[in-house]
Structures are given as C-alpha cells and as structure tokens.
Amino acid sequence: GTSPSGAHTEPWTFVVVQDPYLKHKIREIVEEEEEINYKKRMGDRWVNDLKRLRTNWIKEYLDTAPYLILIFKQVYGQLPNGKKKTHYYNEISVSIACGILLAALQNAGLYTVTSTPLNCGPQLRVLLHRPANEKLLLLLPVGYPKKDATVPALSRKPLEDIMVVM
C-alpha cells in the first residue's frame, strides 16, 4: 500500500478472494440484498436511472471473475493495550487507495467494475472473518472480459464541465 492516508494510519484491508466456494457465497449474499434494493429499497427512479447501464441484481461475474477484491475501511484501529486508535478520515483515505488500485488494475490490462453492495457489509464481514472495526466500502471483481462482453457506450463530461481554472 503506497496510498496517502489521514495521519498515515493506513485504515484499509484489501481482501482478495479466489476460492470458488467463497466467491459463490459472496454472490448469494450480494444478489439477495440487491434484489431487495431493486424491488423495494431504492424506488422506481433509481431503477429507471440504471436501465441504460443494463444492470440488475444478478451478478454472475462474482462467480466467474478470477478474483474478487473486497475493500474494507477500518473505522478505528487497535492499540497494543487494546484501546481504540483513531483513524482520521478513514473513508476518504480508503477511497483514495481504491482510486489508485483502479488505475493500477487498468494499467496492468485488467478489468473491473466498481460495486458498492448496499446492506451486504455485515454478512460479508462475517463470511470473511473480518473484525467489527472493518466496514465494507467497495467490491471489485477483477479479471479479463469475456470475448463477447458488451459495454454500454457511455460518454464522459467534457473537461470544461468538471474543472474550473482560476
């Protein structure tokens, strides 16, 4: 880990899963919660906004990707005396580390999709034997796309819409 972090606390844990059984259990947990998200929690507007991305609660790629990287933020650390250690800016620190990881994966020719599986964190934390101070921030399936994979043609905002020069 070479990412900057608040007070150099490095408040992250990257869990790399390659075991087929664990990947399938992760898929089951994610799909169960995602179906509830799509049908009940998020509402019609959210579901309609996602239509152009052709996504739904079925996440076959969680079984087929060679690796799943689950990134946990450490809300606090543990000192040798058992007391809690403050992790300053833990979410933004871990988010920066994730951005660097995404750039490195792309540079290595690997593919992923960012996934923030809502309401799955506690079950995944237990499945992966993570401590209570860790909260799931991001799930990345990593590998190469299928030869017949299609990606929606998405355009990006022009630079002048996202940057102000003074």
Predicted regions and their residues:
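N-terminal amphipathic, basic helical "cap/leader" segment at the start of enzyme domains
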Residues: G1-T64, M166
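A generic local secondary-structure boundary/capping motif
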Residues: W57-E60, V126-R130, A153
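Generic beta-strand structural signal
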Residues: A65-Y67, A108, L136-L138
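Active-site-flanking beta-strand signature of metal-NTP-handling nucleotidyl enzymes
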Residues: L68-F72
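Small-aliphatic-rich amphipathic alpha-helix that forms the alpha element of a beta-alpha
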Residues: V75, L79-V126
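Short, electropositive alpha-helical surface patch
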Residues: P122-L137
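C-terminal helix-cap and adjacent tail motif
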Residues: K135-M166
